Amino acid sequence: MSAFTDLETLAGDLKRSSAGVSDYHDRAVTPAQTFAAIRPHLRDFGITRVGLLTALDVLNIPVAFATRPNSHTLSVFQGKGIDNEAAMTSAAMEAVETRIAEIAPADLTQATVESMRAERAAMIDLDNVARCAPDEIGSRPIPWCSGLDILSGSSVFVPWWLVGLDHRGERPPGFEQSSDGLASGNTPSEAVLHGLCELVERDAWALTQLKSPERLKESRIDPASFGDAVIDVMTDRITRAGMKLLLLDMTTDIGIPAFLAVIMPGNLSDRVDARWSHVCGGCGCHPDPVRAALRAITEAAQSRLTAIAGSRDDFSPRIYQRLDRSAAMQQVVELCEGDGRMRPFQPRHHRKATIQETIGHIADRLVATGIEQIVVVPFPHPALPVSVVRVIVPGLEVDISGQYIQLGMRAVNTIRGAES
């Protein structure tokens, strides 16, 4: 299948109308059905085990893992959800999508950035991609693939090093590889929606880290104010386990609900053995605030279990060391332990929408804040019964760590606001 045909298939799916089967996830079929579809293919993608980690912790919030020993990045992947099927599917899909991103297409175009610009080729706006430093790329030819700008409907060239994943050997100069925006789904549209939400979440988290302590304190949310039964169950499990839950509203001017959840022992300040792994966080984003909050809470639980299982290849030894109460960590602990009043979440009007309508809503909000491109690169695979894409949105921020990270105007304006 040609790259042009792949983009046509993606564009066609984005014009369809398909709804999720549950109030709690955007999938055309249930997580159990998705897992049943991909299970026969797991070994072909090098995935040797998928299992549950939930019982290793006291929270009883479903968390799963998938193992792929010969990965070019991490060899263990995590998944979370509101039930076991969702967690298992989440872990397996993450392992699958990462493997797919390791396979470079045979028809990559080799060209320098300068030659692309000289020929006025339609390309992604590298000057505003957070994980790219154009001045550091150099004058050597680099590989390019084709993506679809869903705002204009046009094909654009994208450097493969912004799309694929390979952490072996030397990293390509000028690019900070990451899994941000790499997503999968039962259909291309499902995958695009998941990738978009993740990028808006990363932007919100990056800006949250730049806010003043006063602004953060004002952002604390009472989980009970959502009035959702599943959030109430999760909160009750955390409390019964002797833990505290901090929920911060990270929603930016984009207007798509985004939250940070932090779980820590209720007696952390009294413990002489307090460690970094005792304070675990997670983020979530979705136009439906309940889904956004649940993603944050379940990801915080996933962070705890990942530390307990010791299953991340890229863990720093520091995570198991005594908590030294650095300024940033002290701030988080104080927010968790503070007795100040939490504000109720003011729900924005949210109506049930199809997956494609939800993508359109997010795209409209991004355009309203100055975003000019939303680029999607599909990863077609003949044997795979699900879809994998990479979504890239020039102009959105990412966590400010890495050699080739560009600080954008959204971050600059947040810093100015914190200083004023």
From Swiss-Prot:
Residues annotated as domain YcaO: 79-420
Listed transmembrane segments: none
InterPro entries noted in UniProt: YcaO-like_dom (IPR003776)
UniProt xrefs under PROSITE patterns: YCAO (PS51664)
Pfam family for this entry, one: YcaO
NCBIfam families: YcaO-type kinase domain (TIGR00702)
This protein's name: Uncharacterized protein in tfuA 3'region
Native source species: Rhizobium leguminosarum bv. trifolii
